[in-house]
């Protein structure tokens, strides 16, 4: 799959997954890989910088959780600003997706 096409969807999908519930980084990557039948395989080098940017922008917040003697995980959750951004990004994606599909469908109709 074209990685350039996938890059623009990273923050949208992160926000969408976090709307369901708080998740840690590996859980986000595993969930998106499973739900896209492997089309999206997020690497740490792209996922964590995106998470940090979303956190810096106030769209998500992070909290360490776990047992004191056990392994702690950094869980990310959506903020109210993140919910608003998700709504905007979802609407923008729907418009872009519709426009691209119209062009592709018309191209195939003419062939």
Predicted regions and their residues:
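N-terminal helix-turn-helix DNA-binding core of bacterial DNA-binding proteins
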Residues: 2-46
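Short secondary-structure boundary/capping segments
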Residues: 32, 52, 67-68
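Basic amphipathic alpha-helical segments that dock to polyanions
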Residues: 47-54
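Glycine-centered, phosphate/nucleic-acid-interacting loop/turn motifs that mediate DNA/RNA or nucleotide
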Residues: 58
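Short beta-strand "wing" residues that participate in macromolecule-binding interfaces
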Residues: 62
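Basic, amphipathic "hinge/linker" alpha-helix immediately C-terminal to the N-terminal HTH DNA-binding motif
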Residues: 68-90
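Amphipathic alpha-helical dimerization/coiled-coil segments
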Residues: 84-111
């Amino acid at each position: 799959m074209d990685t350039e096409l996938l890059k623009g969807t990273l923050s949208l999908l992160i926000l969408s997954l976090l709307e369901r519930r708080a998740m840690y980084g590996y859980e986000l990557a595993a969930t998106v890989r499973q739900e896209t039948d492997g089309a999206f395989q997020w690497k740490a080098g792209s996922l964590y910088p995106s998470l940090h940017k979303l956190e810096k922008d106030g769209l998500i917040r992070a909290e360490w959780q776990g047992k004191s003697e056990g392994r702690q995980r950094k869980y990310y959750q959506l903020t109210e600003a993140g919910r608003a951004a998700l709504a905007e990004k979802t609407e923008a994606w729907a418009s872009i997706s519709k426009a691209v599909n119209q062009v592709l469908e018309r191209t195939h109709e003419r062939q």
